[in-house]
């Protein structure tokens, strides 16, 4: 169905989101912190998603371009975010981590809880964070889950304020994700890699779960 031109047969709307994000994190104790921030971005053609995906098809996959029929409309998006992280040390280099997080705005309205087990020498700041705390060459492993509840998701449902979207789908309110991976620090360079298995965003999706690999590189500019 990759090259299907009839949007009525799609299992997920085409959608792109290009944004700038600001996030400020405040340490409360050696095992807890909170953060807050926001995003301002654009959806639709201005997100450049269509061009980037088809460029990937040209340069990497050597496949024809995707149709991108009835993609989500071009609109300005504004979102705010907040989170609270708490870790619980079990014994040396073994910790349980937890994080409550929420997003509120035109693109998404949701809340989630991330819980997992962190094993290793690197500071435990959550699975998605790749901040460099120190320059020591260390390694950590993690396994965990994210349990999320969505009230609104633009990439499936379109705007809260108008009916411009050509194709919308019912969003699953409850979603979950399971992941495992590692963080490795090489002094000024840190790598985060994880394998993820995500539940359906909408019941229209043909596969029960969506697996994907996430790789993040962080470099400390001195």
State the predicted function of each range.
Residues 2, 122-222:
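Outer membrane beta-barrel transmembrane domains
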């Amino acid at each position: 169905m990759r090259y299907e031109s009839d949007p009525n047969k799609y299992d997920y709307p085409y959608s792109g989101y290009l944004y700038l994000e600001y996030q400020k994190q405040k340490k409360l104790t050696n095992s807890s912190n909170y953060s807050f921030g926001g995003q301002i971005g654009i959806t639709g053609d201005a997100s450049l998603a269509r061009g980037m995906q088809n460029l990937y098809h040209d340069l990497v996959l050597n496949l024809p371009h995707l149709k991108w029929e009835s993609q989500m409309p071009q609109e300005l998006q504004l979102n705010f975010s907040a989170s609270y992280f708490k870790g619980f040390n079990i014994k040396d280099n073994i910790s349980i981590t937890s994080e409550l997080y929420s997003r509120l705005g035109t693109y998404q309205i949701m809340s989630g809880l991330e819980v997992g087990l962190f094993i290793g020498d690197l500071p435990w700041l959550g699975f998605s964070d790749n901040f460099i705390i120190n320059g020591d060459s260390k390694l950590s492993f993690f396994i965990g889950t994210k349990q999320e509840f969505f009230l609104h998701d633009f990439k499936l449902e379109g705007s809260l304020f108008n009916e411009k979207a050509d194709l919308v789908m019912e969003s699953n309110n409850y979603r979950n994700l399971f992941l495992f991976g590692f963080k490795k620090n090489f002094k000024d360079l840190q790598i985060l890699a994880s394998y993820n298995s995500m539940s359906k965003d909408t019941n229209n999706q043909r596969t029960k779960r969506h697996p994907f690999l996430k790789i993040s590189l962080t470099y400390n500019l001195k």
